[in-house]
Regions:
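Helix-to-loop junctions at the C-terminal end of transmembrane segments
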Residues: 88-101, 312-323, 411
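Hydrophobic core of transmembrane alpha-helices in multi-pass small-molecule transporters
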Residues: 117, 129-144, 270, 353-367
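Helix-loop-helix hairpin linking two adjacent transmembrane segments in secondary transporters
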Residues: 172-225
Length: 449
């Protein structure tokens, strides 16, 4: 009689810090396929919503060049979109934790809300309706998709969190590129309705379908080919331990928000997001104001978006080797220098340099999102990482108001270069703030008297 191979037993183990892991199940046993498919579905969903943020500036510039119109009101529509997108992240994480909101339900619901944005601006010129459809509904939908996809990937790749979260969040930039090219090539006031309707339908279908296929692993799941107890202490197995910290204990969101480290992360997120969003939205407008062509503006934003996307994954990998805080400091310094370079190349009518500095700004301007997400897990622990990062990520809403809303007030007066100079300075200030990041839970030791 032949013996049948029985599945590996599921066991719960604890590391030296008391964190528990569920070990013994492979993804094929749980969902019938490799976890790579969960990464792919999340990447596709994120890629399709990127146009809502990264394509807005080019679409607005293309319509303004071909038909004129008021830029200030339209820019505030996007600023408010960022407010609702960032504000939706923390509630989504809470709903997922407390009410077991599955990604296969959350992402399709978010897809329907996301599609309301382009569908609304396709069918109306009314400012209040645009705010309701694009800023509120589409913003909330994008926040739901972003928070859910990021958390799902982090749960499937607990041993590669930084790199995989960087990869999936980077899809937002990469996925916007075809839409940026489309807007720069054919978008005019005459075909606006048809173009935006098509964008909305594609977004609804693709994001909903990809999201419906997403599943979470069991709570505390860990890949069976790695011993989590060794992973927690062995620097040859887990190379990120050499230059990164591990949490003293596991912090709930209510505990994390009371620590100095949370406050510093929140301030860095506000400043970094404001500077990054300024570049994403205003690079095409700055290009046109300085006499460059719409084609050059689109190339600059396209490069920015691609490098922004790929740079997030690269930053995650580098942070494993060099340290999260050190990599974050470098990214913020590069962002500040790149924004200074944008002003120099724009005022000097240097188109190639302008596109290059836009790409460099994108590289740094996307890196801080996965880096801060990884720092949250390093400082406050893995079990509540999604909810804790959602709380930090909400700082982006203030970044949207500062980085998009305030410059909209001076866009008509041709003072955009001044806004970029201010952004450069505050990016450097944010880099200095990283020196104040310290792992919570350590005793305060003073000098002897």
């Amino acid at each position: 009689m032949l013996a049948t191979e029985s599945p590996s037993p599921v066991v719960e183990v604890r590391d030296h810090r008391g964190r528990s892991y569920r070990v013994g199940e492979c993804p094929e046993d749980l969902i019938g396929c490799s976890r790579t498919w969960m990464l792919a579905f999340a990447w596709i969903a994120m890629a399709c919503i990127g146009v809502l943020q990264y394509g807005f500036g080019v679409a607005l510039t293309a319509l303004h060049v071909t038909g004129g119109g008021n830029l200030t009101g339209a820019l505030w529509v996007l600023a408010l979109w960022v407010v609702f997108q960032a504000g939706a992240a923390a509630p989504t994480a809470v709903l997922s934790h407390r009410f077991a909101l599955s990604p296969s339900r959350a992402v399709p619901a978010g897809a329907a809300l996301c599609a309301a944005g382009p569908l609304t601006v396709a069918l109306t010129d009314d400012f209040m309706l645009a705010v309701l459809g694009y800023s509120v509904l589409s913003g909330i939908g994008a926040g739901v998709v972003y928070a859910t996809c990021t958390a799902t990937v982090a749960k499937w790749y607990p041993e590669k969190r930084a790199a995989r979260v960087g990869l999936v969040t980077g899809a937002i930039g990469c996925g916007a590129v075809p839409f940026i090219a489309l807007f720069a090539t054919i978008l005019t006031p005459d075909n606006r309705t048809a173009v935006f309707l098509a964008v909305g339908v594609v977004m609804l279908v693709v994001v909903a379908q990809a999201g419906a296929l997403l599943q979470n692993p069991p709570e505390g799941w860990w890949p069976q080919h790695i011993d989590p107890r060794q992973w927690a202490i062995d620097k040859t197995l887990n190379r990120s331990l050499s230059n990164n910290v591990t949490p003293i204990r596991q912090y709930s969101p209510s505990e994390a928000v009371r620590t100095p480290a949370f406050l510093v992360m929140y301030l860095i997120m506000v400043v970094a997001a404001a500077a990054s969003l300024l570049t994403v939205v205003y690079v095409p407008i700055l290009a046109i104001h300085q006499g460059f062509s719409l084609a050059l503006a689109a190339v600059a934003v396209g490069l920015l978006a691609v490098v922004n996307g790929t740079g997030r994954s690269i930053a995650g990998r580098l942070s494993d080797r060099l340290g999260r805080r050190q990599t974050l400091t470098a990214a913020l310094l590069v962002q500040g220098c790149a924004q200074l370079g944008l002003v120099y190349s724009a005022s000097g009518a240097l188109p190639v340099a302008f596109a290059g500095f836009a790409a460099l700004s994108g590289l740094a301007g996307g890196a801080f999102y996965p880096l801060i997400a990884s720092l949250v897990a390093d400082y406050f622990g893995e079990p509540s990482a999604a909810r804790n990062f959602g709380a930090v990520y909400s700082a982006k809403l203030f970044g949207g108001l500062v980085g998009i809303g305030l410059p909209a007030l001076v866009v008509a007066s041709q003072h955009l270069p001044l806004a970029f100079l201010v952004a450069s300075a505050v990016s450097v200030m944010a880099a200095v703030l990283t020196r104040l990041l310290h792992r919570p839970g350590l005793p305060v030791v003073g000098l002897p008297r």
